[in-house]
Amino acid sequence: LYSIASSAIGDFGFGDSKLDFAVSRGIDDIMVDLAAK
């Protein structure tokens, strides 16, 4: 699931690496939240 999400984000082609980092961290946080429930 994570790799699919990463691929989808990559397909959007965000040029700002800081934005990429923020988005990927956000996904990590969501995954952690889901895993904790």
Curated annotation (Swiss-Prot):
Belongs to the ferredoxin--NADP reductase type 1 family. Its cofactor is FAD. This is Ferredoxin--NADP reductase, chloroplastic. GO terms for cellular component: chloroplast stroma; chloroplast thylakoid membrane. The keyword Hydrolase does not apply. May play a key role in regulating the relative amounts of cyclic and non-cyclic electron flow to meet the demands of the plant for ATP and reducing power. The keyword Nucleus does not apply.
